[in-house]
Each structure stands twice: as structure tokens, then as C-alpha cells.
């Protein structure tokens, strides 16, 4: 088993309303270096809240009620994420952990070219780079995600949904983070484009060695791409196992219910394609 990259211990998030709502309850898990960890569960189970919480991206009334998150940096330094001040946390994000947000392909600025939006990442986080260097990095990123450098002057409306999503993946990949969190990255894409995006995520993971937390309610999709899957229900992780174990030998009744809720073309379970 590879070494850990992220350790989450007894992590809890509460929405401070009347009455308070426990959105994440004492979650403990470990993400391994180079691993794709799927996070599955129905809408409202706390998946996105957990992902935002470990990156300290929560907004009021959500508050971290307990627990800790440790990032095991490739340099050998263990970083207590909850202990970082605001400035250090801003430096940490995108450099160490990046995120592809839910509905991200619609988050691009419609009146700015994709090239200028990608350059902004380097302008903010790599201020020592000159314009020529930034442009070269952007062109390379567009080639890596198979959008193509010829699209550098294109506006978002000139790209398909799949291409816009690839641009968002390029943005998350820009600073070569060790962890990429993806919140429903294939939502609103047709099945063929979904499959292309999933294949590319897997290829990029192998090429650059980053880990992925992949969040979705679509369990069959996670069975294809994930090394391990955590099943979440009502703020708790009720099962955590390899994708094969989740598919062939689920232990929790809720996991079995999730698996049985997806229709199949035949009356029997299909063969897991990985």
C-alpha cells in the first residue's frame, strides 16, 4: 500500500442554524498517494461539505466542529491544515490541493478568453513568471488536456461543454498539485464525453502522480475510475473498501441499496469495466 497523502481524523462540520445540523459526523479516512478515492452517496449526504471542509472553503453558517486534517507533503513535511493562517492557506490552495468545482464548466468568465483565465492562475501564484513564460505554460496545459493551443484565444461560448470542462481541469492542474478534488466533474455531459473525461483524468493521474478525491452520486461511474470508494450517508462514512469489494461484496445495507438502485440492461449484474 502506498504512503498516505491526506489524513482526516474525527472530522465534523455543523451548520450553525436553529436547530444546528450535523452535516459531517466524525469522519476518519486516509487518502493514499497516487490514489483515486471515490466519495459516493445521495444528494445532501455531506460529500461536498466534507470536501470543502478539508480545504477550509466552508462559508457561514457551516463551521468545523471538530477533528483534524493533515497533509503529508512530498517534501516530507506534515501540514496541519486547520493550523494554517489565512495567508498560508491561500498559498497552500492550488499549489498543494486544487479543486474542480461542481458546475465548473459554467464558471468560466464569458467575456475573457480561456488563455487569459488560465494565465491568471500563474499571475497570482507565480508572480515571478513573465508574460512569455505564462503563455508557454498555458499552451502546454491546453495540449495536455487535449483542447489544443490553437484555442488559447477562444471564448468559453466557442467551446463545447466537454472542452470547457477540460479547461477547468487544466486550471486545476496548472500548478501541479499533489491532490485534486473533483466535485461532480462530469455532470451535464453526455455519456460519450463523460467517458472521455474519465479516461483523461485517469491518464493524467498516472502521468503526473497526483491523487484524486472524486465526488459523485453516480456509483457505477465511481466503480470504473476509483481505486477505493467511500460510501457516505447522513454525514457519516458507512463503508470504505476497494471498488472491486464494493461491487462484488458490499457489507453495508445502504451500499447494497445504492447498487440495486441503478437499472441494468440485463436482469443480472454486468461486468465491472476498469
Where do the protein language model's features map onto the residues?
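A short, surface-exposed alpha-helical micro-motif characterized by mixed small hydrophobic
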Residues: 222-224
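Conserved ABC ATPase signature
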Residues: 155-159, 163
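Conserved ABC ATPase "signature" region
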Residues: 72, 132-150, 259-260
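Short catalytic/signature loops enriched in Gly
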Residues: 3-4, 78, 145, 152, ...
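ABC ATPase "signature
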Residues: 237-241
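A short, proline-enriched helix->beta-strand linker immediately N-terminal to the Walker B motif
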Residues: 174-178
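ABC ATPase NBD coupling module
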Residues: 75-98, 116, 124, 131, ...
